[in-house]
Amino acid sequence: MLVFSATFTAKPGAAQAVIDLVATLIEPSRAEPGCIRYDFLQSPYTPNQFVFFELWKSQADLDAHFQEPHFLAFAERLPALTEGSFEKVAYETDGPKPAA
């Protein structure tokens, strides 16, 4: 399995536009083959700070996600609403484990 996160910052005044844009992405992404979890989070402390937190069966599934029409449409529009860089991180895991 692959854990993936992408953190980014909306331009001042653009947080709601980001939320509205992401709303078009969530359900189709969750329905994709290989998607185990797909969450979009907004910081309660810095409202312009957002993160995608995702769990995929494989790197191939994540790569396929990035080629889906709904993702490509989203990716085309998002840069106009954000500032700074995107922090992307991925980790391989063999799945959730119970807490000790």
Regions found by a protein language model. Give the residues of each.
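Short alpha-helical
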Residues: 13, 47, 69, 73, ...
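An amphipathic, aromatic/His-enriched active-site/gating alpha helix that lines ligand/cofactor pockets
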Residues: 20, 24, 28-36, 55-89
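Short, well-ordered beta-strand segments in beta-rich or mixed alpha/beta enzyme
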Residues: 2-8, 39-66
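N-terminal first-folded block
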Residues: 2-40
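Glycine-rich beta-strand-turn "strand-cap" elements at beta-sheet edges
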Residues: 40-45, 76-100
